UniProtKB/Swiss-Prot annotation:
The gene is pxpA. Gene3D superfamilies: Glycoside hydrolase/deacetylase (3.20.20.370). It is an enzyme of class 3 (hydrolase). Forms a complex composed of PxpA, PxpB and PxpC. One of its GO terms (molecular function) is ATP binding. Its EC number is 3.5.2.9. It comes from Escherichia fergusonii (strain ATCC 35469 / DSM 13698 / CCUG 18766 / IAM 14443 / JCM 21226 / LMG 7866 / NBRC 102419 / NCTC 12128 / CDC 0568-73). This is 5-oxoprolinase subunit A. The keyword ATP-binding applies. GO terms for biological process: carbohydrate metabolic process. Catalyzes the cleavage of 5-oxoproline to form L-glutamate coupled to the hydrolysis of ATP to ADP and inorganic phosphate.
Amino acid sequence: MKIDLNADLGEGCASDAELLTLVSSANIACGFHAGDAQTMQASVREAVKNGVAIGAHPGFPDRENFGRTAMQLPPETVYAQTLYQIGALAAITHAEGGVMRHVKPHGMLYNQAAKEPQLADAIAKAVHACDPALILVGLAGSELIRAGKHYGLTTRQEVFADRGYQADGSLVPRSQPGALIEDEEQSLAQTLEMVQNGRVKSITGEWTPVEAQTVCLHGDGEHALAFARRLRAAFLERGIAVQA
């Protein structure tokens, strides 16, 4: 059994370098919600050095709110913006001797694409247009996964160690109670349950089926790094290989 561990990089966190020693995939911010050409280059170099799979992390053009505010953009605009961001990171990755493997949308773009078919289709279409070999990462069971499969892309279904789930398998919005799991034991138990048994307990108590192919780790701060180390160790202890 294997599991991919992914983390978002190039978003201004001081812990990026250490996080790259723990994860198997890196999602690199492409300049819209965070990052710039130089942070993208630095992140790619570190990922190549650590043998970590490189992916683009496109977001809404919303630096002020870190890409976490809902935006109602036409699908053709989202398509063009996604192409633009993937293309920029692909060029930098190529120049640094790496290979871009996947695309994972950021923040509210990710959340809206999980539920809005037109937005999901625009993103999947852009990924396919850039390179049909790219893997599309999205919330397990979401519209984005459906759209990726529709375009013939390989998809990777993502679960979250530190986020609460609703009964329909969607994440509890950050604005609501129960959105973030701050207890390390609870996060660890939830993640192992999702990976080993394919289910998650919602905040209302129901067990919801979920397919876990990659686990998102948030790496900001020493506490997050300590949890990342502990989670990786827990997988290895159970014979679960960590690899992209």
